[in-house]
Amino acid sequence: MSATLRGANARFGNLLTAMATPLYPDGSIDFAGAQTLAKWLMAGGNDALVINGTTGESPTTSDDEKLDLLDAIIEAIGADKVVAGAGGNDTRHICKLAAASAAKGVAGILSVAPYYNKPCQEGIYRHFRAIADAAAIPVLLYNVPGRTIANIDTATTERIALDQENVIGTKEASGNMMQVADIVSRTPDTFDVYSGDDGTLLPHLAVGGCGIISVISHVATPQMKAVCTKWFAGDAAGAREAFLLTLGITRMIFAQPSPAPTKAALSLLGKPAGPVRLPLVDLNQSQLEALAAFMTERGLI
């Protein structure tokens, strides 16, 4: 293996954290805390951050909050290190949000497949093309059928990749490694295929993926970075060893609905986090104690 491996020079880098949005106890956004968290994550080794994604509680933040948060994070780390989440099931609405986010100067847009209204593949194709046209900057698709019900089929991903120049990659969280391999085999080498599941990072890399948009990197940036760095340096055994060490962290961080465990872990580290917004709920005392014990045992705190 060498630096010529597909994905080694991914547009946004190999490790991005889907950043949690710090909140005050009353549920309002802690913008200063978000800046502090973003700076800390970047200093730890992230290549870029996804802001206003699912981990950032995008379903329960308003457009105004999303845009204000982008302003704060851009001020903290620079627009070129920010990928803005802009996804939903109302194409016209998301086109406006994507355009407004792009106008902030961010590096790219991450847009999830439309959920609930269960469009056919032609509808998904047209949805993403409309968003990409509206944004007019690099766009990543986000396929997470466990949340959206709608899978972006390989043929649809291929079609968008070939027809829409500024759709430059996808975040695949389908859990279907055959689909991931098919996407890699049917798209140009410049099309970046990110893992959207922390527990599938190494399999993604093995079939030609470029890295990960991670959640556990809030508490394990060096560990996730090591997997990518070793893989692209040609050290497959080292990458495997590093990856296997992350699996317990993944299980713990996803033991309850995300991002509640992530926010609890950040609080244990003394980082800005705060509560989650309903309908999500924070960890209860026993869950928090289990998380603290695990993090202590693993040397994370």
Residue positions per predicted region:
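Secondary-structure boundary/capping positions in well-ordered alpha/beta enzyme cores
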Residues: 80-81, 138, 167, 190, ...
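Glycine-rich phosphate-binding "P-loop"
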Residues: 143-144, 166, 277-278
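A general structural signal for well-ordered alpha-helical segments in protein cores
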Residues: 34, 66, 70, 94, ...
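Active-site beta->alpha loop and helix N-cap motifs at the rims of alpha/beta catalytic domains
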Residues: 3-149, 159
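Helix N-cap/beta->alpha junction signal
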Residues: 90, 197-198, 284
